[in-house]
């Protein structure tokens, strides 16, 4: 399954504005940006060799601009895309330490940092993720993609030690319900579906394993109606089980 993300980027520029940087160039200007009703599809990151090509340029940029958290973010994201998760952690930590609160790439970087910690798993990574979630929740808790990640975090945390974390079981359900309450906001950027069909699907899974078939069917159906094929398959499997 391939996920789709949206992001806002400056591409329609006034005359005279130039790009700066040796890779992942950005407009070298401080003028204000305004949203436009223009969309463009981009599948370049599906290319398997893009990270290998970009990495030397990013390493050079990180050396040239050691105080710039943007290149630390790009180093971390590139290494993550190359499946070098452990190597990416150093760069994520450096990025998180230096990134200013108003940086446009801050939220994306934090979410990728958290997903990397969840993918690496283990008590230390879960503890680190929990600290970051607690610190960022007052601001990022208004975003569906952050709440979606919280649902995954609480699930992993509970499964890591059911006896110790059983009391956090309701947070799994609450996180996905909050995703649906917030809804989709493509103008914010982020993974498509975390405020709709993906959250509904995960709720369906949660209710199914909890033995609540009625609610599982309700949320699987909601997800399937949005065209999410895994939800349609789960609905079909549940129907077969119930007919036996």
Task: Tell me what each language-model feature is.
Residues 61-65, 96-108, 134-146, 180-193:
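Flexible helix-coil transition and linker loops at the boundaries of alpha-helical arrays
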């Amino acid at each position: 399954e391939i996920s789709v993300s949206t992001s806002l980027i400056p591409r329609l520029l006034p005359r005279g504005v130039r790009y700066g940087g040796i890779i992942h160039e950005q407009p070298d200007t401080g003028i204000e940006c305004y949203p436009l009703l223009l969309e463009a599809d981009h599948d370049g990151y599906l290319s398997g060799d893009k990270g290998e090509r970009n990495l030397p340029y990013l390493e050079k940029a990180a050396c040239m601009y050691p105080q710039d958290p943007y290149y630390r973010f790009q180093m971390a994201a590139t290494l993550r895309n190359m499946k070098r998760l452990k190597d990416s952690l150093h760069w994520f930590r450096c990025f998180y330490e230096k990134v200013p609160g108003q940086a446009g790439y801050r939220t994306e970087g934090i979410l990728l940092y958290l997903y990397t910690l969840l993918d690496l798993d283990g008590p230390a990574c879960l503890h680190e993720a929990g600290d970051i979630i607690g610190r960022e929740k007052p601001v990022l808790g208004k975003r569906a993609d952050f709440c979606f990640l919280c649902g995954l975090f609480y699930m992993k945390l509970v499964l890591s030690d059911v006896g110790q974390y059983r009391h956090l079981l309701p947070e799994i359900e609450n996180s996905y319900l909050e995703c649906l309450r917030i809804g989709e906001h493509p103008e914010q950027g982020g993974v498509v579906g975390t405020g709709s069909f993906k959250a509904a699907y995960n709720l369906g899974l949660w209710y199914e394993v909890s033995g609540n078939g009625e609610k599982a069917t309700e949320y699987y159906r909601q997800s399937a109606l949005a065209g999410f094929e895994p939800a349609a398959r789960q609905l079909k499997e549940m129907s077969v089980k119930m007919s036996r």
